[in-house]
Amino acid sequence: MNWTTDEFLKRLYEETKNERLKLRSGKKHTGVDRQELSGRLRQALGNFPGTVTPLQPIVLEKKDYGDYYLEHIKYTTMESVDVPVMVLVPKDGKGSWPAVLACHGHGNGQRDAVGLAPNGSVLGEPGIHNRFAVELVKRGLLVVIPEIMGFGVRRMAEEIIANPNYSSCGTLSSQLLMFGRTLAGMRVYEAIRALDYLQSRDDVIASRIGIFGFSGGSLISAFTAGLDDRIKATVLAGWTNTFRGSILAMHHCIDNYLPGILLDAEQPDLIGLIAPRSLFVESGENDPIFPLENVREAIAELKEIYYGMNALDCFQSDLFPGSHEISGRKSFDWLAECLRS
């Protein structure tokens, strides 16, 4: 007798998939379908704050890092919620510049995107984030890196004391559900506020804003770009896949899961909300948590979506020899070119 629940979940996925395909039959990726899907994504992300709080940005410190200036600032995203933000400003000329919102993945927080130690010194090894924010500012892009909720200094106080290397994703995700919110939703909301901040800067070309995410930061980037058309170009590194092939196939952080989303969409459907705007997907061929087979499956569906919108030339991808990491061998230059044109 087999008492395990594996078969139950497999069957539930198939039943849900079949029902979803019936509901979207004949209208998949049409204007009506995309509008409905956007609404369902917004619903699955949970409640956003009812009042838009003034950002009130303050520059705390400015340092010269040779190739760029690093501003440490803070702004307010929600009542009683201040966010530490790094801003990398190019040295070539005097603005205005195209800009990028950089969304880091799991790890030490915003400093991973720059490759910095806690004291602000440059680390010897770039790590899996590959100093992507520095690579972008070197290409003449102003880069904003907010500390994402649940990482770095934005963890729960008790968890910072208990384990310096442990995120607060589990605590925040579970408790936010009790308020009709999700951690993914709060992160997307704060990404939208980061776009507000970028557009408020005199040295930013407001019509040329991109977003670059890695791993869980790609989730934030994909959903933010899908909901907010102020984003001109998007890079998703180390995340694009199918839910079935990744977060349903193995253990992943709880911050990846959205209530009821499979009733309406698989992951490529949601990423497809970015179309027809420019999108670049990169993934390591040996990424163990976002398997290559399912990356290829997602890319094929995204190509179909972009083709259907007569925008296939706006979609690019790179499967590089590597693991769960940022490559940037093609995506860095691609994003810079998109935002300059």
Outline where the language-model segments fall.
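N-terminal targeting or regulatory segments adjacent to alpha/beta-hydrolase or S9 domains
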Residues: 1-69
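Mobile cap/lid helix-loop segments that gate and shape the active-site cleft of serine hydrolases
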Residues: 171, 178, 193, 231-271, ...
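N-terminal cap/lid segment of alpha/beta-hydrolase-fold proteins
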Residues: 47-95, 99
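C-terminal catalytic histidine-bearing segment of alpha/beta-hydrolase fold enzymes
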Residues: 300-341
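Cap/lid segment of the alpha/beta-hydrolase catalytic domain
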Residues: 95, 103-189, 200, 246-248
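Alpha/beta-hydrolase fold nucleophile elbow
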Residues: 203-215
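Short glycine-enriched nucleophile-adjacent loop
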Residues: 198, 218-229, 335
